Amino acid sequence: MEIRDNNKVNLCFAFDNLRKELSRPYGILFTNNKVFLDFVSKSIQQGFKVITVGDYVSRVLEENGIIPFLEVIDGKTKRSIPQHRAIVKNKEYRVTNEAGKIQFEIFEIIENILKDRDGGVVFVNGEEDLLVIPVILSANNGDIVIYGQPNAGAVVIIVNEMIKWRVRDILEKAVVEEC
């Protein structure tokens, strides 16, 4: 396939073959909001970035005075309940991403945002759940990535080389296809 002269590569990683593997939490599962918020606050005090993937966890932090460096949201919780944002950031980005996939271009977008000193919000038209993968690969060691585990709580991943290796291993098992 010739892609050299295309402005946009229309390829995705597809994860249909990995649904079971991806359904379990890959970090610390917090079921108590007070313990969760205390942990996040201490991480911020130590100078690490907080990155959220999901509307509900982003909103819980915001309502408790914690503003994530980067939020990846789609405006919904459990795929249908609209979420209204209380905080507006200076830098907002919009991407499209199908459920069960990650578009190649999103890796570069997230990497660039995490290099920027201001962070921002990525609004996803589609599904944001799997964008934990490019977030972890682009985050610095020590940063914390938070996502919601439906009907369970919030999962916190402390980024390190072991986690990045695990995420790269999952990515290698994904199927590359046209979006």
From Swiss-Prot:
The record lists the catalysed reaction(s) as: 3'-dephospho-CoA + GTP = GDP + CoA + H(+)
Q: Which keywords does this Swiss-Prot/TrEMBL entry list?
A: Coenzyme A biosynthesis, GTP-binding, Kinase, Nucleotide-binding, Transferase
Q: In which pathway does it act?
A: Cofactor biosynthesis; coenzyme A biosynthesis
* Enzyme nomenclature, EC number: 2.7.1.237
GO BP terms: namely:
coenzyme A biosynthetic process
Positions binding GTP in this chain are 55, 57, 74, 76, 128
- Nucleotide-binding recorded as keyword: yes
- What role is this protein assigned? Catalyzes the GTP-dependent phosphorylation of the 3'-hydroxyl group of dephosphocoenzyme A to form coenzyme A (CoA).
What does the similarity note say?
Belongs to the GTP-dependent DPCK family.
- Name recorded for this polypeptide: GTP-dependent dephospho-CoA kinase
